[in-house]
Amino acid sequence: MFEWLARALYPEPEVLAAGLAVGLMLDLAYPEHRGLALKLHPVHTSYIMALRLVRPGAGRAWGAAIWLLTISSHMMVYASLLAASYLVHPALHTLAVGVIVKLSMPLRLLLDTCIKASRMAAAGRVECSRRLVQGIVRRDLSGEPLGRVLSACIESTAESLVDGYTSPLTYYILLGPLGALLQRLSNTLDGAVGFKTPLLYRQGWFSAKADTLLNFIPARLTAVMVALAAPLAGASTLGSLRCIARCARLLESVNAGYPISAFAGALDVRLEKKGFYIVNGGAPYPGWRDGLKASRLAVSAASLYTVLAALAIALGGGAG
């Protein structure tokens, strides 16, 4: 009786492939949401909802409730979109899948900041570069030398490649478009409440752990993809693999060390968060050319990951 609903929520392989292509094209054409599109974006609405549910003095149980309430309410909206579009027309259903892909995997937006910041640095506009990078990282970059500014930029690119593209793509293959959205929402909630502050330490625990769990395998797969794709960006596969083996566990984060060390080794640069960690410490700080190369490396790794994802979708169709 509900077989149609299963096909609507987890489409056939050809629809998954077409939806992925549509979503990536939408991302290239319209990378940054503004106005009403931004206000209705699930990353924005879930972030606001989670913060509004925070209660002073609440513990881990309420933190789990924040995650469940926020995730389930958003998933219901997009599940309804998939179901309704499926009943109307196959083309509309494919478009709905593509829209969810676009909302869940903002690849171009993740890359643009690093490219712009590196170009500003190349032009000698260090303060402009600093302001751009400050917009994507939490650490205070005021007074930091350009090398540490570009380090923060490359680190953010490496982490965002996992959080914003390869991880949701992994769950897209496994669970369909709602799987990609689940990962993106979970990552957003970690960014909203997953902090070790007196107010959020207990309430954010569940969101932080959920994000760590969901990204555990994709982070490691992505590090391997970065190493394999390194020659496409003029970087070093061997250097990347060596740095992963040597430095991936230096960070407090269970996952972030893998893509960051993969980038550091591939580019042969020192990536540092002052007072917290130094990755590939024997190498020089990155310059603007390294920032541009990091963007090319991210594109190369994402492209390789996408090709393998498409192959997995095709093999799934053949198995079916």
UniProtKB/Swiss-Prot annotation:
The UniProt record lists the keyword Cell membrane: yes
Pathway(s) served: Cofactor biosynthesis; adenosylcobalamin biosynthesis
NCBIfam families, per the entry: PRK01209.2-5
Subcellular location: Cell membrane
UniProt protein name: Probable cobalamin biosynthesis protein CobD
Signal peptide, first to last residue: none
Listed transmembrane segments: 8-28, 57-77, 81-101, 161-181, 221-241, 297-317
Organism: Aeropyrum pernix (strain ATCC 700893 / DSM 11879 / JCM 9820 / NBRC 100138 / K1)
Alphabetic keyword roster: Cell membrane, Cobalamin biosynthesis, Membrane, Transmembrane, Transmembrane helix
Matches recorded under InterPro entries: Cobalamin_biosynth_CobD/CbiB
Record's bilayer topology term: Multi-pass membrane protein
GO cellular component, one term: plasma membrane
Pfam families given in the database record: CobD_Cbib
Keyword Transmembrane helix included in the entry's annotation: yes
Alphabetized GO MF terms: ABC-type vitamin B12 transporter activity; threonine-phosphate decarboxylase activity
Protein family: Belongs to the CobD/CbiB family.
Name of the encoding gene: cobD
Function per UniProt: Converts cobyric acid to cobinamide by the addition of aminopropanol on the F carboxylic group.
GO biological process, one term: cobalamin biosynthetic process
